[in-house]
Amino acid sequence: MAKKTQKRMPRRREEFTYRGYSVADLQQMALSELLPLMPARARRKFDRGLSREHEKLLADLRSGDENIRTHLRDMIIMPEMVGRSIEIHNGKEFQKVEIQPEAVFHYLGEFALTRRRVAHGSAGIGATRSSKYVPLK
């Protein structure tokens, strides 16, 4: 049998589309055009209006600042944020998050988890009745 000497082609990642629109198309749209595409929860947030803090975060993103830190976990990820890295506070520290196209119209807080899984060790001396008789090391 003859061996195949062809190189494997790297897998091409399909271009992300949101409800039939590419990220570039979404970035060109005005907010009034984006509202019908958003899920209901995000649409309600924009209908009620953004707070000053949310407006300031969007202004910082538009200005091109590299280091953006925020406590605004309830901010909706807009198409203009794609490709940027934002540090989101999780209650203890800031976690750096790279905004991917798949994250559009999700909340920032979904990507900086506030709880960590607890890995309990073995019981210590006196933790239970049976551990009273465990010899010390």
UniProtKB/Swiss-Prot annotation:
List the GO biological process terms: ribosomal small subunit assembly; translation
Quote the cellular component terms of the Gene Ontology held in the record: cytosolic small ribosomal subunit
What are the protein's GO molecular function terms? rRNA binding; structural constituent of ribosome
Covalent S-S links between cysteines:
none
Could you confirm whether the keyword Ribosomal protein appears in this record?
yes
UniProt keyword list: Ribonucleoprotein, Ribosomal protein, RNA-binding, rRNA-binding
InterPro entries assigned: Ribosomal_uS19, Ribosomal_uS19_euk/arc, Ribosomal_uS19_SF
Q: Does the keyword Nucleotide-binding apply?
A: no
Q: Name one Pfam family in it.
A: Ribosomal_S19
Function per UniProt = Protein S19 forms a complex with S13 that binds strongly to the 16S ribosomal RNA.
User: NCBIfam families in the record, alphabetically?
Assistant: PRK04038.1 (NF003121), uS19_arch (TIGR01025)
Q: Which family does it belong to?
A: Belongs to the universal ribosomal protein uS19 family.
Full protein name: Small ribosomal subunit protein uS19
